[in-house]
Amino acid sequence: MSGCGCGSSCNCGDSCKCNKRSSGLSYSEMETTETVILGVGPAKIQFEGAEMSAASEDGGCKCGDNCTCDPCNCK
């Protein structure tokens, strides 16, 4: 969606919407759920996080400052 590309040519392409709030694509929402399981054994704490971002479909790339990829972690 954001035009980010990985590999030796890691970049945010022409459709990069960095620092432009008109379409709302530069916003990210973070939701975290904490689960505490108590019982006979030691306490176990489990964190489940779901991050939604416009660049989440770009294989780990997201647009950073000045339309650079931050980070570019494609696998």
From Swiss-Prot:
One of its GO terms (molecular function) is metal ion binding. Keywords: Metal-binding, Metal-thiolate cluster. It holds the Pfam family Metallothio_2. Metallothioneins have a high content of cysteine residues that bind various heavy metals. PANTHER family: METALLOTHIONEIN-LIKE PROTEIN, METALLOTHIONEIN-LIKE PROTEIN 2A. Belongs to the metallothionein superfamily. Type 15 family. This is Metallothionein-like protein 1. It comes from Pisum sativum (Garden pea).
